[in-house]
């Protein structure tokens, strides 16, 4: 049976075939496998085809279970589950549906403001279905008073679309079934009210986080091309933060190791006249995966180490919340 381009690569890397061995010559792949099998079998003799098959099966299993250097200790089998079954692999990771303590981060802060603003009576929306200007302006002031950014704080807010973090949270809350539109108003759903009564943000935060991972399109928040694999591989980003985030490291440390694990992703990058695909990917990954995912949801701290609002450079470390959001069994 022919391997489809979107199927897991038969080499055991955990990547899709089109992003791994699809462009390697058949002869080079076969030669590599031939050498591995020769080293495994050596001068052994076999009494049946079944014995040979058992050895080959053992070879493939060992290959799948062996740690891969580029994956920082993960095997190709584990990486496959990270990429394709992150929420269905309890032997590796679980995602608690309730936190031990009230979360304090940008996403939780905006979610709390949105829920309070909606209240029991709902919130009137604009003719275009967006949050009202006054609410957005007030939320903008409070947000940047708590999380200072001199450049973003001075931007004019005329509509919800001018306050992108709030817009992202509102959309994600809708996708997660926590709020809904009805007759020109935004209302809390019964699901949201029940979770709010039971455990407040300790239960609401995981719901929004999971909706952001599974339903929200991360590329919508920035000006880069889609590159959906960055979102699909969210768990590997968190794994790197868990493994190396106990100390401050440059954001490029994570983007470099991400590219080292998935070099074929460069083939998806649209070429630009004055920028290498590697540099485009680096900027996109740092913004999309580190700033607007891990940083926004409080799973990592990002501290700017450069001057000015253009071409910002950051250092990164993980937070205690990461250990609560993902329980690792590795």
Give the label of every model feature segment.
Residues 57-64, 129-133, 137, 219, ...:
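Charged, alpha-helix-forming regions
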Residues 39-163:
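Short, amphipathic alpha-helical interface elements at domain boundaries
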Residues 18-22:
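Cysteine-centered loop/knuckle micro-motif
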Residues 169, 180-219, 301-330:
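Accessory beta->alpha helical hairpin/"wing" motif in late/C-terminal subdomains of nucleic-acid enzymes
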Residues 1-15:
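Short Cys/His-rich zinc-binding micro-motifs
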Residues 82-110, 117, 200-255:
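Leucine-rich, amphipathic alpha-helical/linker segments
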Residues 160-175, 277-297:
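Short amphipathic alpha-helical interaction segments
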Residues 124-157, 245-279:
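Short acidic, hydrophobic short linear motifs in intrinsically disordered regions
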């Amino acid at each position: 049976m022919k391997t489809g381009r979107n199927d897991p690569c038969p080499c055991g890397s955990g990547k899709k075939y089109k992003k791994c061995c699809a462009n390697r010559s058949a002869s080079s792949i076969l030669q590599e496998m031939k050498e591995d099998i020769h080293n495994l079998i050596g001068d052994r003799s076999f009494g049946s085809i079944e014995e040979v098959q058992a050895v080959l099966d053992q070879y493939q299993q060992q290959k799948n279970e062996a740690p891969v250097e580029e994956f920082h200790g993960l095997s190709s089998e584990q990486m496959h589950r990270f990429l394709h079954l992150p929420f269905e692999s309890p032997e590796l990771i679980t995602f608690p549906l309730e936190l031990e303590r009230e979360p304090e981060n940008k996403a939780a802060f905006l979610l709390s403001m949105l829920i309070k603003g909606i209240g029991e009576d709902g919130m009137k929306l604009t003719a275009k279905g967006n949050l009202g200007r006054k609410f957005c302006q007030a939320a903008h002031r409070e947000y940047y008073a708590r999380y200072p950014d001199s450049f973003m704080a001075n931007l004019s807010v005329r509509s919800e679309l001018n306050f992108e973090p709030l817009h992202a949270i509102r959309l994600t809350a809708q996708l997660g079934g926590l709020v809904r539109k009805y007759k020109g108003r935004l209302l809390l759903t019964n699901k949201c009210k029940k979770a709010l009564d039971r455990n407040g943000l300790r239960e609401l935060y995981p719901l929004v986080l999971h909706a952001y991972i599974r339903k929200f399109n991360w590329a919508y928040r920035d000006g880069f091309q889609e590159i959906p694999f960055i979102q699909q591989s969210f768990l590997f980003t968190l794994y790197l933060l868990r493994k190396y985030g106990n100390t401050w490291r440059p954001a490029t440390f994570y983007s470099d190791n991400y590219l080292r694990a998935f070099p074929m992703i460069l083939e998806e990058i649209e070429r630009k006249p004055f920028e290498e695909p590697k540099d485009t990917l680096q900027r996109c990954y740092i913004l999309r995966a580190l700033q607007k995912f891990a940083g926004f949801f409080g799973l990592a701290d990002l501290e700017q180490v450069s001057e000015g609002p253009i071409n910002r450079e950051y250092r990164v470390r993980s937070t205690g919340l990461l250990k609560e959001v993902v329980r690792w069994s590795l």
